[in-house]
Amino acid sequence: MKNLIAELLFKLALKEEESKELCAQVEALEIIVTAMLRNMAQNDQQRLIDQVEGALYEVKPDASIPDDDTELLRDYVKKLLKHPRQ
């Protein structure tokens, strides 16, 4: 029983580490996108936003992906492009 608990705690620690890495990657990408948008002319920003939104609209998600997940992704992309980090 102790071995099972120790193994579960070890697996949980690994998952937590993976989660931290993913969070760091997302944060880094947000910073990069924000910096790029802030250094672009307004018309270039709008052109990029239109292209990204167009690409998202054209992509047909896999049937195995829940609609809520797809909508969450679209909303987050829109938020990041229209209202970058402060």
UniProtKB/Swiss-Prot annotation:
Disulfide bonds: none
NCBIfam families: PRK10244.1 (NF007598)
GO cellular component: cytoplasm
Alphabetized UniProt keyword annotations: Coiled coil, Cytoplasm, Stress response
Functional summary from the UniProt entry: Inhibits RpoS proteolysis by regulating RssB activity, thereby increasing the stability of the sigma stress factor RpoS especially during phosphate starvation, but also in stationary phase and during nitrogen starvation. Its effect on RpoS stability is due to its interaction with RssB, which probably blocks the interaction of RssB with RpoS, and the consequent delivery of the RssB-RpoS complex to the ClpXP protein degradation pathway.
Transmembrane segment boundaries: none
Natural source organism: Shigella dysenteriae serotype 1 (strain Sd197)
Similarity field: Belongs to the IraP family.
Protein name: Anti-adapter protein IraP
Coiled coil stretches, renumbered: 2-36
Assembly and oligomerization: Interacts with RssB.
